[in-house]
Amino acid sequence: DKKEIARVANDIRLQLNPHPAGQMELNVPQLKDGTKLYGMQHKYDETCLFFPSQSQTCHAYCTFCFRWPQFVGMDEMKFAMREGEQLVQYLKEHPEISDVLFTGGDPMIMKASMFSVYTDALLDAKLPNLKTIRIGTKAVSYWPYKFLTDSDADETLKNFEKIVKSGTHLAIMAHFNHLVELSTDPIKEAIKRIRNTGAQIRTQSPLLAHINDDADMWAKMWQKQVSLGCIPYYMFVVRDTGAQQYFGVPLVKAEKIFRTAFRKVSGLARTVRGPSMSATPGKVHVLGVSEINGQKVIVLQLLQGRESEWVGVPFFAKYDENAIWLDDLVPAFGEKFFFEDELKTKYTKTA
C-alpha cells in the first residue's frame, strides 16, 4: 500500500527534526501588509535567505544535508517562493538587509534564464541597501559542467558578470567536503571561469564523522582552495537534524580538529571560522577549552545572533567531551546562558 508506506515514512521524517533552530516558526518573515513569505528566511539583521521554487532540488543528495525537507515531497515542510517582486518589496521594507543568499536545494539547478529573472529583479530595483548577492551551491564541486559545457554555462557566467558590473558583490558559497573534490581538471577550470567574472568563491563544509574528521585533510583542503583563488569561510558543526548521530562530531573534538588544521596554514587560509553551530540563538562558535577558577569549561561566542547585541559575547559551558550540539551543553556558571531569558521572551514558540 503506497499510501501507508508514505504515511509511515512521513512519520519517521517528522521525528528527525526537519526544521532545526526554529526555521519554520521563527525565521519566516512577512511584508508590512501581513503577507507571510514562506520562500524566505530572515534570522540575522543583515542577511536574508531566498528559496526560489525552481531550485528545490540538487545535483547531490548528501545524506548529511540539513535541507533534506526540501526534497522529500512534503510540501508543508518546504521553503519555496516564485515571486521575485515580493523579495524586492521585503528588501525595500528592511533597509538593514545588505545581503541576499539564494539557497535551496541548489540555485544552480535552475537554467540561467530563470535564475536571471530573480537577479535582474534585484538589480533593476537599484536597492541602496543591497550590497551582496550570495549563491549557496554544491555545483562547483559536484557538477562543475554547469560552468563549463552545460547549454547555459556561458549564459550563467554572463549573468555573474552582469551582477558584478552593477556594483553588487557576488559571492559563490561553494560546498567542498573533502580535498579530493578539488583534484579534477573540470573543478579547477570551473573555479577559474567563475573567478574571471569578478565573483568571489568562499568555501564551507560541515565537519563530518567518517568523511572529513581529520585535521591534516582540512589543512590541505584550505591550502588547495587558497591556491585556486578561493576563500576558506566556515567549518560547520553537523546540525541537529536527520542523521546527526552518525555524522556528528563531539564539540571538543571538533574544536581540536579545527585548531590543529588552523595552525598548519598561512594567514591567507585563516579567513576560515569554526567550528560553528547554526542553532536557535544564532551561529555559536566553539572557541576552545579553558579552565576558570579550577573548573574546566568550553568557551563559546556567537558569530551571528537573533539579537545583534549577543554577538561576540563570550560564554561558558561545563566541559563535556560527548556533547555534539548546543542543547547538550550546560552553563558553567549560573543556571542559564546569558541570552536565554531574552530568547524566551521574544521567541517563545521554540525557546
Describe the role of every protein-language-model region:
Residues D1-K43:
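Flexible, acidic/Gly-rich N-terminal and inter-domain linker regions that tether
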Residues G34-F66:
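N-terminal pre-triad scaffold of radical SAM enzymes
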Residues Q41-T47, W68-V100, M110, V117:
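Conserved alpha-helical substructure of the radical SAM core
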Residues Q54-C58, W68-V72, G105-M108, V140-S141:
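Short acidic/polar capping segments at secondary-structure boundaries
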Residues A60-F64, G73-M77, D185-P186:
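A short secondary-structure junction signal
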Residues E85-V88, K92, M108-K253, I257-V265:
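Conserved AdoMet/S-adenosylmethionine-binding subsite of the radical SAM
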Residues S98-V100, L130-I133, L170, T271-P275:
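Residue-level recognition of the N-termini of beta-strands and the immediately preceding loop/turn
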Residues A219-A351:
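Auxiliary Fe-S-binding modules of radical SAM enzymes
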